[in-house]
């Protein structure tokens, strides 16, 4: 670097979810009053980047998302996403040759235990995909499992807010067609997939999975209708147990196995910790289950030794953060709670490593039920400004 060059800090600001479209209709960004943004746009050079489909390692027609965006920006190259990896494995048939899964399923059959499939059930493609559930059910069928239970988490964020009926009807039809499986409970993702340490939400989902919910019905379609009657859209439908033919709840029991079907990790970690970890203390578990096998579609936590990832993590070498560190430069990652994993873990290529010279600051997100109650979140926090200035 020439000695005459000024050494000034550089800011990379990621406006998550911000996009460009010329049409005014239903375009909140274009219709908003943004004098500062518009001033920057009109004064300085700018360009567009594609943030979906094959441009970020996703299948054709698949929208991008926060994790994918941060991963590709941090990598500086196209990174094949887990959705595409899993789809390819199913298409090639390799998915159905997974020895650890097959051996676990054989053990369940020999011991008369049950398989429980958990996860977000939709075709949103951000955290999971319903096609992966169907592939896992096919494998369970091939292994001649008799006791297979599905605990779908309802979407309504990456899909329309009242679209759960079509997905659950489709699931029920598929279960009847293949001749195995029963829906044992449902839960809105607001409860089962919290990532902001709102543990009372996770506790409700945990109790439904392990003991049964005080809210119970005999038909999952009825459970959704009742949720709508309570003015709950899909993501907010309270954990509900679906009774069996003997009017009993179906729960995860000692010796049963679990496969968590989410391939995105951030919203799967908390409920996994509650189900699996011996030293868990975020809330008092009224019932601790000894799960025989706990599979996750991808790795949720590299330090977790009690679960097994079906698809191992792929490494992204020489990411932006790693490169900056190798140059001996300093870097600061700052975000509030909701996006902290994205500017750290995902931006570093799915790597938990904190590089030399890398500082991290987490600004707490506001404690509100939903962020439409405080849409600015913590953007006006003095901590953002003071920490940036101090670095």
Set out the residue ranges of the language-model regions.
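Active-site nucleophile/metal-coordination loop of metallo-enzymes that catalyze phosphate/sulfate
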Residues: 2-10, 19-190, 200, 204, ...
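Short helix/loop capping segments that flank catalytic or ligand/cofactor-binding pockets
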Residues: 22-23, 82-83, 194, 250, ...
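Short, basic/glycine-rich phosphate-binding loops at helix/coil junctions
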Residues: 16, 77-86, 356-369
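Conserved small/polar residues in nucleotide/adenosyl-binding loops
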Residues: 383-390
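Short, hydrophobic/glycine-enriched beta-strand segments
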Residues: 9-15, 258-262
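Conserved ATP-utilizing enzyme core subdomain
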Residues: 330-382
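Long, well-ordered, tryptophan-enriched scaffold segments
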Residues: 109, 159-253, 266-288
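Active-site pocket-lining segments that scaffold enzyme catalytic pockets across diverse folds
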Residues: 250-270, 276, 287-291, 299-302, ...
């Amino acid at each position: 670097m020439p000695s005459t060059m000024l050494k000034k800090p550089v800011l990379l600001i990621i406006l998550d979810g911000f996009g460009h479209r010329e049409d005014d209709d239903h375009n909140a960004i274009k219709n908003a009053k943004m004098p500062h943004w518009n001033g920057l746009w009109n004064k300085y050079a700018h360009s567009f980047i594609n943030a979906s489909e094959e441009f970020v390692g996703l299948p054709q027609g698949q929208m991008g998302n926060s994790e994918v965006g941060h991963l590709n920006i941090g990598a500086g190259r196209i990174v094949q996403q887990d959705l595409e990896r899993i789809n390819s494995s199913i298409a090639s048939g390799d998915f159905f040759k997974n020895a650890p899964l097959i051996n676990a399923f054989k053990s369940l059959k020999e011991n008369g235990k049950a398989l429980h499939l958990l996860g977000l059930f939709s075709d949103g493609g951000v955290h999971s995909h319903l096609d992966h559930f169907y592939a896992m059910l096919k494998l369970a069928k091939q292994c001649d499992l008799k006791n297979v239970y599905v605990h779908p988490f309802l979407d309504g964020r990456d899909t329309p807010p009242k679209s759960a009926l079509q997905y659950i009807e489709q699931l029920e039809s598929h279960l009847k067609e293949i001749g195995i499986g029963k829906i044992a409970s449902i839960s809105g993702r607001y409860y089962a997939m919290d990532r902001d340490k709102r543990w009372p939400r996770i506790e409700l989902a945990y109790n439904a999975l392990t003991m049964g919910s005080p809210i119970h019905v005999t038909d999952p379609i009825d459970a959704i209708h009742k949720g709508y009657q309570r003015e709950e859209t899909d993501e907010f439908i309270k954990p509900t147990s679906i009774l069996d033919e003997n009017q009993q709840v179906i729960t995860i029991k000692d010796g049963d196995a679990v496969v968590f079907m989410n391939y995105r990790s951030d919203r799967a970690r908390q409920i996994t910790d509650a189900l699996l970890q011996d030293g868990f203390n975020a809330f008092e578990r009224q019932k601790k289950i000894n799960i025989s096998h706990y599979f996750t579609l991808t790795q949720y936590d590299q330090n977790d030794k009690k679960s097994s990832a079906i698809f191992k993590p792929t490494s992204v070498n020489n990411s932006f953060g790693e490169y900056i560190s190798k140059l001996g430069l300093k870097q600061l990652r700052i975000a509030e709670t909701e996006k902290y994993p994205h500017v750290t873990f995902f931006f570093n290529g799915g790597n938990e490593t904190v590089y030399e010279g890398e500082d991290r600051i987490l600004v707490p997100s506001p404690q509100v039920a939903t962020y439409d109650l405080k849409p600015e979140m913590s953007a006006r926090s003095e901590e953002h400004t003071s920490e940036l200035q101090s670095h």
